[in-house]
Curated annotation (Swiss-Prot):
Gene: obg
Enzyme class, broadest EC rank: hydrolase
Family: Belongs to the TRAFAC class OBG-HflX-like GTPase superfamily. OBG GTPase family.
Name this polypeptide is given: GTPase Obg
EC number: 3.6.5.-
Residue ranges, annotated region (Disordered): 332-356
């Protein structure tokens, strides 16, 4: 299934049905009186968060959704039928924005959550409604009210417990494939991962969801590379695992490049708990490894973990530390406080330092 995390959609609720002008006509009843029924209510446009979806690809091929119009009233006090509503199904984690792409209308966070995006128009009154002691035979009825219409943006943000960040070719996809059943594309060239990937990880009996997003490069917030739009998928994460390639030219500079892009994106990403790990330690000699570790430690102001996604060295320790942070931090909390003792006791769990 193709991945799509943003779609523009047009929705229109149903118009209300018209009221009816009718009179009772029966044998031997000279003045039967009005009996025109009311129009039916138009259908709503409803959006529902469902389980089992992780893409908005369906809305690439169909962008227009219209609910059914309410039925017109008829004689013998028959009211029009209500219009059938339209239900748009989206993944959990989807946000609805107005046409300006900035005004948040609703955020879906739980399975089964429903939101009425456009209400159907009310049906018009038939002439029976207007009967009164002074007007025994009204000859007018109301038309149905028009429905609502609008353009909206659907934007999906994956719901994961932990997120993998780093430069392209930092080994994020290899790490994800090592610790979960996910099968991301792995190759020795930049931007192998073009879309976010999810994997379920089991660390000593504790399960959590890990998200791998495409790599960031310098200037990503200005559109370089694949840009930084995929960072939205780690906004809901409780902890970030920052992988730095031990074979790169300078581990400290690589770390700061990603940090700068996180700051430029915003979204409280820089306030999240971060675990820093030096990856691909099997591909460098001991002297170079020590040099890169020291560079990364100075840049991050914390002692990095040493891991290898290829051989599995240090991977279990990294998963345990991720699980520890996730178990301590509720889903609703987006950032770890600097006063939290759990964050200050362990150097790998300290909040991200401010960058000049």
């Amino acid at each position: 299934m193709k991945f799509l995390d943003e779609a523009k959609v047009y929705v229109r609720s149903g118009d209300g049905g018209n009221g009816c002008v009718a009179f009772r006509r029966e044998k031997f009843i000279e003045f039967g009186g009005p009996n025109g029924g009311n129009g039916g209510r138009g259908g709503d446009v409803v959006i529902e968060a469902v389980d089992g979806l992780n893409t908005l690809i369906d809305y690439r091929y169909q962008q227009h959704f219209k609910a059914q119009r309410g039925g017109n009233g008829s004689g013998k006090d028959c009211h029009g039928a209500g219009g059938k509503s339209v239900v748009l199904k989206v993944p959990v984690g989807t946000q609805i924005f107005d046409e300006d792409r900035e005004t948040l209308i609703h955020d879906f966070t739980t399975v089964g959550e429903r939101f009425v995006l456009a209400q159907g128009g009310n049906g018009g009154f038939g002439n029976a409604h207007f009967k009164s002691p002074t007007n025994r035979a009204p000859r007018h009825a109301n038309p149905g009210q028009p429905g609502e219409e609008r353009w909206i943006w659907l934007r999906m943000k994956l719901i994961a417990d932990a997120g993998l960040v780093g430069l392209p070719n930092a080994g994020k996809s290899t790490f994800l494939s090592k610790v979960s059943a996910a099968k991301p594309k792995i190759a020795d060239y930049p931007f192998t991962t073009l879309h976010p990937q999810l994997g379920v990880v089991n660390a000593d009996g504790r399960e959590f969801v890990l998200a791998d997003i495409p790599g960031l490069i310098e200037g990503a917030h200005e559109g370089a590379g694949l840009g930084d739009r995929f960072l939205g998928h780690v906004e809901r994460c409780r902890v970030l695992l920052h992988l730095v390639d031990a074979t790169c030219e300078h581990a400290g500079k690589a770390y700061k490049t990603v940090r700068h892009e996180l700051e430029a994106y915003g979204g409280d990403l820089t306030d999240k708990v971060e675990i820093v790990a030096l990856n691909k330690i099997d591909a460098v000699d001991p002297d170079e490894l020590k040099k890169q570790k020291d560079r990364l430690k100075r840049a991050a102001k914390k002692t990095p973990l040493l891991i290898s996604g290829a051989t599995g060295e240090g991977v279990k320790e990294a998963l345990r530390k991720l699980a520890d942070v996730i178990s301590e931090q509720p889903v609703s909390i987006k950032a770890k406080s600097t006063s939290d003792s759990a964050a200050t006791e362990e150097p790998w769990a300290a909040p991200l330092p401010p960058q000049g």
